């Protein structure tokens, strides 16, 4: 059986080293469209595996550990978005990739942190309901001032990125005055304002490569530091609290187990209703159409 392993930039080093492809959510979605393998192992969290399954409905998609979930994605239910949308009938719904398949099915288009601004800019509607990350919504609003970006739900955020404060960043910058400051747009807007560069995980890696950065203070989950150090030689300083426990649930041993298994146990197999697959595929493909 031919197997292909995808891993997100936040995964443990041993998992990244076992992967055929490592990237951010956008890169993994693009990769998933081109995979020609019997089994795809998605090393990340639940919503990532659902996107891979939607783009590969006839392939076996499995995860190393079914408990790897995203707290931000779990905060919003499809019913809540459906009800909120009724209150704003003239608004388009842009759903961040960090959502369940059921929530994606209620949207007009999906986006990732790498292309959120581009997706929102490309829509004809003046009002945009943006779910579920309020910090990313604020970042988009800043860069698309001619549209009204309505964040939903209230206080939706990634707890890891939201925990990074301006004082945290100032302290690290005072200790490393020669370092460039790079952060993820899931961070609060006031933190983004302090950065030399704001971007998705792979955009941050590309920045280090392009700018030949010798040292960075990095405001995102610490797993990215391994890839940057390995591929660019950049010294990476990360706040100690920026660790996502869900992203660390997968281990090299668990990946090895699903690679060796002739039959993967049911909890590790990603299954979606055919109608849901069609709806998720539609919003993902709409994203590709708007940003091609």
UniProtKB/Swiss-Prot annotation:
The keyword Metal-binding applies. Keywords: 4Fe-4S, Cytoplasm, Iron, Iron-sulfur, Metal-binding, Pyridine nucleotide biosynthesis, Transferase. Its cofactor is [4Fe-4S] cluster. GO terms for molecular function: 4 iron, 4 sulfur cluster binding; metal ion binding; quinolinate synthetase A activity. [4Fe-4S] cluster binds at residues 70, 158, 244. One of its GO terms (cellular component) is cytosol. It catalyses: iminosuccinate + dihydroxyacetone phosphate = quinolinate + phosphate + 2 H2O + H(+). SUPFAM superfamilies: NadA-like. Its EC number is 2.5.1.72. It comes from the Archaea. It is found in: Cytoplasm. Iminosuccinate binds at residues 8, 25, 96-98, 113, 184-186, 201. One of its GO terms (biological process) is 'de novo' NAD biosynthetic process from L-aspartate. Pathway: Cofactor biosynthesis; NAD(+) biosynthesis; quinolinate from iminoaspartate: step 1/1. Binds 1 [4Fe-4S] cluster per subunit. Catalyzes the condensation of iminoaspartate with dihydroxyacetone phosphate to form quinolinate. Belongs to the quinolinate synthase family. Type 2 subfamily. This is Quinolinate synthase. It comes from Methanopyrus kandleri (strain AV19 / DSM 6324 / JCM 9639 / NBRC 100938).
């Amino acid at each position: 059986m031919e197997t292909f392993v995808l891993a997100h930039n936040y995964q443990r080093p041993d998992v990244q080293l076992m992967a055929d492809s490592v990237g951010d959510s956008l890169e993994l979605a693009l990769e998933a469209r081109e995979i020609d393998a019997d089994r795809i192992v998605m090393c990340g969290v639940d919503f990532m595996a659902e996107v891979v399954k939607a783009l590969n409905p006839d392939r076996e998609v499995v995860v190393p550990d079914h408990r790897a979930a995203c707290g931000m994605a779990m905060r919003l239910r499809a019913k809540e978005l459906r009800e909120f949308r009724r209150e704003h009938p003239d608004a388009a719904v842009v759903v961040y990739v960090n959502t369940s398949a059921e929530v994606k099915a209620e949207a007009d288009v999906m986006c990732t942190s790498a292309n959120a601004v581009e997706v929102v800019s490309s829509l004809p509607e003046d009002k945009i309901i943006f779910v579920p990350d309020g910090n990313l919504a604020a970042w988009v609003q800043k860069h698309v001032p001619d549209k009204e970006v309505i964040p939903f739900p209230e206080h939706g955020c990634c707890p890891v990125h939201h925990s990074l404060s301006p004082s945290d960043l100032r302290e690290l910058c005072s200790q490393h005055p020669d370092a460039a400051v790079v952060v993820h747009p899931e961070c609060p807007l006031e933190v983004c304002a302090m950065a030399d560069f704001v971007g998705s995980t792979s955009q941050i890696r590309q920045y280090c490569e392009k700018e030949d950065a010798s040292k960075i203070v990095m405001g995102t989950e610490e797993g990215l530091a391994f890839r940057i150090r390995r591929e660019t030689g950049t010294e990476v300083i990360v706040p100690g609290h920026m660790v996502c426990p869900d992203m660390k649930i997968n281990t090299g041993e668990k990946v090895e187990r699903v690679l060796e298994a002739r039959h993967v146990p049911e909890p590790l197999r990603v299954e979606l209703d055919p109608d849901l697959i069609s709806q998720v595929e539609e919003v993902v493909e709409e994203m590709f159409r708007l940003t091609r």
